[in-house]
């Protein structure tokens, strides 16, 4: 899988990321579009994974401070799940974080995919959990070494 990065919304990478997010979150999971497209994409980094130049996986990256990176909107196209693309995407993000001297990654995981993140050594940081867009979530984190 080939990865492309961009910042903001005036680029093809963002448009490709948005197409995956619309399919996964709005169409599949029925997340309200005003929640998914929250008006903050223009200040975030976006990464998209391509297979044969077709966008298949994406995430939104939000540096919170000099040490902490928040990973958001992680999505893999429905037809490509279970093939390791999500793992490749997370590896790409972790490599980018290390290159840019981030020490800690945090994310809000939908409960059904917590095992995916646990396999990548993320730990639940709030045992009580919460609902976001009607979907149960838990915060998770990983310290980079």
Q: What do the PLM-derived regions correspond to, one by one?
A:
Residues 21, 117-118, 122:
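Conserved active-site tyrosine of GNAT-family acetyltransferases
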Residues 48, 54-63, 67-75:
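Conserved beta-strand in the GNAT
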Residues 63-72, 81, 131-137:
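A conserved beta-turn-beta hairpin within the catalytic core of GNAT-like acetyltransferases
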Residues 76, 82-95:
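Conserved acetyl-CoA-binding loop-helix of GNAT-fold acetyltransferases
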Residues 90, 95-110:
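Conserved GNAT acetyl-CoA-binding A-motif
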Residues 108, 123-139:
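Conserved catalytic-core motifs of GNAT/GCN5-like acyltransferases
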